């Protein structure tokens, strides 16, 4: 399972359509990070990847992905934003393995699909050779 979380419904729709080209995944989209977190907690071990926007009402993407990783450290995560994130904050969260990849908005469809495939492959390797 792959989740796309962004408060912009157009983005979730566009990304879902783009990722349908990857046959091995089931995609869920959410515009509310709280609902996405609830869905994740019910299905946490079925998830392979969570893609989240940074700036969302109620729970920002960094906090959201930290909660995801606290529940299942093996799930892969991608953070995306149109805003500049402080390098120190980004590096700290990357080092803690909360964020596995970052995409700067506007995200090109090719870049999105390529990064998702990279993260799916990394998940498979991680399952074979857990650290």
What are these regions (language model features)?
Residues 1-10, 15-16, 50:
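Conserved acidic segment of CheY-like receiver
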Residues 9-28, 96:
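Two-component/phosphorelay signaling modules centered on CheY-like receiver
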Residues 32, 60-66:
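Acidic catalytic/metal-coordinating carboxylates
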Residues 63, 84-101, 114:
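Alpha4 helix (beta4-alpha4-beta5 surface) of REC/receiver domains from two-component response regulators
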